[in-house]
Amino acid sequence: MAEKRNIFLVGPMGAGKSTIGRHLAQMLHLEFHDSDQEIESRTGADIAWVFDVEGEEGFRRREAQVIADLTEKQGIVLATGGGSVQSKDIRNYLSARGIVVYLETTIDKQVARTQRDKRRPLLQVDDPRSVLETLAESRNPLYEEIADVIVKTDDQSAKVVANQIIEQLGF
């Protein structure tokens, strides 16, 4: 697996993709990118605004373009948005252009980690747990489909998880 130079992190909201990705990039001396942050940078607006104005479909179009662009780079760690795997094109980019690491977490951990985060448009509802359960049903099989490595993130620090990823990848 070490012949692929890019590492792409996939997984649900609250799995720790951005935090773990930063640690991983630093430890491996790679460039770190976050697809959501890149969308915000390109649009000059936050994700919630993009959802409000363009809807989820507009956001997903932007996300696909950003991930297509970023996965063409070499020597990066990319934290993807939780829903990015819904796109067959994105799954293909990720699988073909790097090592895909699925950061797995429980619904309980997701709720705990995201409950105060107002930047997550899909969770601004009365019952976010129900939304997370529904998303898990449809997305978890897609994460598993493209994963080269699966790492559980519950009850571990980001640094510990980053070290586990490095060990599993043989870097």
Curated annotation (Swiss-Prot):
<keyword id="KW-0963">Cytoplasm</keyword>
<dbReference type="GO" id="GO:0009423">
    <property type="term" value="P:chorismate biosynthetic process"/>
</dbReference>
<dbReference type="Pfam" id="PF01202">
    <property type="entry name" value="SKI"/>
</dbReference>
<feature type="binding site">
    <location>
        <position position="139"/>
    </location>
    <ligand>
        <name>substrate</name>
    </ligand>
</feature>
<dbReference type="GO" id="GO:0005829">
    <property type="term" value="C:cytosol"/>
</dbReference>
<keyword id="KW-0479">Metal-binding</keyword>
<comment type="function">
    <text>Catalyzes the specific phosphorylation of the 3-hydroxyl group of shikimic acid using ATP as a cosubstrate.</text>
</comment>
<dbReference type="InterPro" id="IPR027417">
    <property type="entry name" value="P-loop_NTPase"/>
</dbReference>
<feature type="binding site">
    <location>
        <position position="60"/>
    </location>
    <ligand>
        <name>substrate</name>
    </ligand>
</feature>
<keyword id="KW-0057">Aromatic amino acid biosynthesis</keyword>
<comment type="similarity">
    <text>Belongs to the shikimate kinase family.</text>
</comment>
<keyword id="KW-0067">ATP-binding</keyword>
<feature type="binding site">
    <location>
        <position position="36"/>
    </location>
    <ligand>
        <name>substrate</name>
    </ligand>
</feature>
<dbReference type="GO" id="GO:0009073">
    <property type="term" value="P:aromatic amino acid family biosynthetic process"/>
</dbReference>
<feature type="binding site">
    <location>
        <position position="18"/>
    </location>
    <ligand>
        <name>Mg(2+)</name>
    </ligand>
</feature>
<dbReference type="InterPro" id="IPR031322">
    <property type="entry name" value="Shikimate/glucono_kinase"/>
</dbReference>
<dbReference type="InterPro" id="IPR023000">
    <property type="entry name" value="Shikimate_kinase_CS"/>
</dbReference>
<comment type="pathway">
    <text>Metabolic intermediate biosynthesis; chorismate biosynthesis; chorismate from D-erythrose 4-phosphate and phosphoenolpyruvate: step 5/7.</text>
</comment>
<feature type="binding site">
    <location>
        <position position="82"/>
    </location>
    <ligand>
        <name>substrate</name>
    </ligand>
</feature>
<keyword id="KW-0418">Kinase</keyword>
<protein>
    <recommendedName>
        <fullName>Shikimate kinase</fullName>
        <ecNumber>2.7.1.71</ecNumber>
    </recommendedName>
</protein>
<keyword id="KW-0460">Magnesium</keyword>
<dbReference type="GO" id="GO:0008652">
    <property type="term" value="P:amino acid biosynthetic process"/>
</dbReference>
<dbReference type="InterPro" id="IPR000623">
    <property type="entry name" value="Shikimate_kinase/TSH1"/>
</dbReference>
<keyword id="KW-0808">Transferase</keyword>
<keyword id="KW-0028">Amino-acid biosynthesis</keyword>
<dbReference type="GO" id="GO:0004765">
    <property type="term" value="F:shikimate kinase activity"/>
</dbReference>
<feature type="binding site">
    <location>
        <begin position="14"/>
        <end position="19"/>
    </location>
    <ligand>
        <name>ATP</name>
    </ligand>
</feature>
<feature type="binding site">
    <location>
        <position position="120"/>
    </location>
    <ligand>
        <name>ATP</name>
    </ligand>
</feature>
<feature type="binding site">
    <location>
        <position position="156"/>
    </location>
    <ligand>
        <name>ATP</name>
    </ligand>
</feature>
<comment type="subunit">
    <text>Monomer.</text>
</comment>
<dbReference type="GO" id="GO:0005524">
    <property type="term" value="F:ATP binding"/>
</dbReference>
<keyword id="KW-0547">Nucleotide-binding</keyword>
<dbReference type="GO" id="GO:0000287">
    <property type="term" value="F:magnesium ion binding"/>
</dbReference>
